């Protein structure tokens, strides 16, 4: 019957396939040195893949190249966090030596090293209207955290963070506030604040000791509470070491107008200030230029930089810089994000936490060694809680370095 013959053919073919398969299995068995089957070994685990982590950053209008606030934030993400440096419009690997040379001695033991897998994504803001769309663009690109650099991004960070609760955000220099101005927190937003008044106090104390005509100057950017902390600390520091000194105070009204900074700097030097401290973002580059030109013309004047060590801009003119370690705040957030430890809330960094300090004093002036010793004594008192630094000029005692515009 056709059905029986078909069944027989299927049976024969199946048997042949089975024999062939068994033979191949025997041939495929690994053998030991004596020709015997090798003993079974545990499977080799594949090397773990480096977890990719995109971290985004939105600058304020000062942007990259301000040699100050934004550049400090970029250093914390790009160099310290990712081990990268920007060159020719693209990232290149930075050497360990390049990272090390940006760390002051007090940071050498904090274990700062690139975080494996971090890729920076940076968007520069030309106008304030760029802040919110830039932050949202970072979220759309899949970043694990979006960083808003500066208090001017507060509203944008708040809006985008509420819209995207699964994305982490880092806000520098501001807390979130409700409609009544009361601070509050979101679970996906870390705010990093600094005790600028403490670092400003130290450079003010140094300015008071370095001044020869008892007249120093302060240049602020926008006249807002944040910059008032710089002014208050500086004036208190001057008064602590040189009660006879007068502090000339002026504001440029911006953070991105180098020409305005230079004009105000020239004005203060003309009025007799021989040490000028600026807290004015990119405007401060103009202040430094004004003092540099005054020194070239024979005037014994100094300038004090801010946020980053600005001595490279005018080595002979920069007395020191008040270091506000935005880079440290950014780096610690990147590290915590990678370790799954980033939580919402406010973090404040002062002298005790390494968040503020002053740069090495590379220039010479009479009494330098004694001046630095005095400044360090004042630092110790602040860290120990024995000396409280005012956070607003209204808190200064009546006798403390009266300000003149």
Range-by-range predicted roles:
Residues 18-21:
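C-terminal motif of bacterial Sec signal peptides marking the signal peptidase cleavage site
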Residues 23-405:
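A residue-level marker of the well-folded mature domains of exported/periplasmic proteins
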Residues 1-11:
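Bacterial N-terminal signal peptides that target proteins for export
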């Amino acid at each position: 019957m056709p059905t029986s013959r078909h069944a027989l053919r299927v049976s024969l073919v199946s048997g042949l396939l089975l024999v062939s398969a068994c033979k191949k299995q025997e041939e495929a068995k690994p053998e030991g040195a004596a020709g015997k089957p090798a003993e079974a070994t545990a499977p080799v685990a594949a090397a773990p893949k480096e977890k990719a982590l995109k971290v985004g950053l939105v600058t304020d209008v000062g942007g990259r190249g301000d040699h100050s606030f934004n550049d400090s934030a970029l250093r914390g993400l790009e160099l310290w966090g990712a081990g990268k440096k920007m060159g020719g419009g693209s990232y290149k690997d930075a050497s360990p030596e390049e990272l090390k040379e940006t760390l002051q001695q007090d940071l050498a033991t904090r274990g700062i090293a690139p975080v494996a897998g971090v890729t920076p994504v940076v968007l520069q803001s030309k106008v304030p209207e760029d802040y919110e769309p830039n932050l949202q663009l970072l979220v759309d690109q899949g970043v694990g955290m979006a960083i808003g650099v500066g208090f001017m991004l507060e509203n944008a960070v708040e809006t985008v963070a509420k819209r995207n609760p699964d994305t982490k955000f880092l806000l520098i220099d501001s807390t979130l506030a409700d409609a009544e101005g009361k601070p509050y927190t979101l679970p996906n937003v870390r705010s990093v604040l600094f005790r600028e008044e403490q670092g400003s106090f130290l450079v003010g104390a140094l300015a008071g000791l370095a001044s020869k005509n008892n007249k120093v100057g302060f240049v602020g950017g926008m006249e807002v509470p944040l910059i008032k902390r710089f002014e208050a600390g500086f004036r208190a520091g001057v008064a602590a070491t040189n009660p006879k000194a007068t502090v000339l105070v002026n504001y440029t009204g911006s953070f991105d107008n180098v020409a305005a900074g230079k004009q105000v700097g020239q004005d203060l030097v003309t009025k007799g200030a021989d040490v000028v401290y600026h807290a004015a973002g990119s405007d401060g580059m103009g202040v430094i230029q004004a003092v540099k030109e005054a020194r070239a013309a024979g005037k014994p004047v100094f300038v004090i930089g801010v946020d980053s060590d600005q001595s490279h801009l005018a080595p002979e003119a920069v007395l020191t810089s008040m270091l506000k370690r935005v880079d440290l705040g950014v780096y610690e957030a990147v590290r915590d994000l990678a370790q799954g430890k980033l939580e919402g809330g406010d973090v404040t960094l002062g002298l005790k936490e390494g968040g503020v300090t002053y740069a090495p004093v590379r220039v010479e002036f009479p009494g330098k060694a004694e001046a630095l010793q005095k400044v360090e004594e004042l630092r110790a008192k602040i860290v120990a809680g024995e000396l409280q630094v005012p956070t607003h000029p209204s808190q200064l005692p009546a006798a403390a370095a009266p300000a003149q515009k």
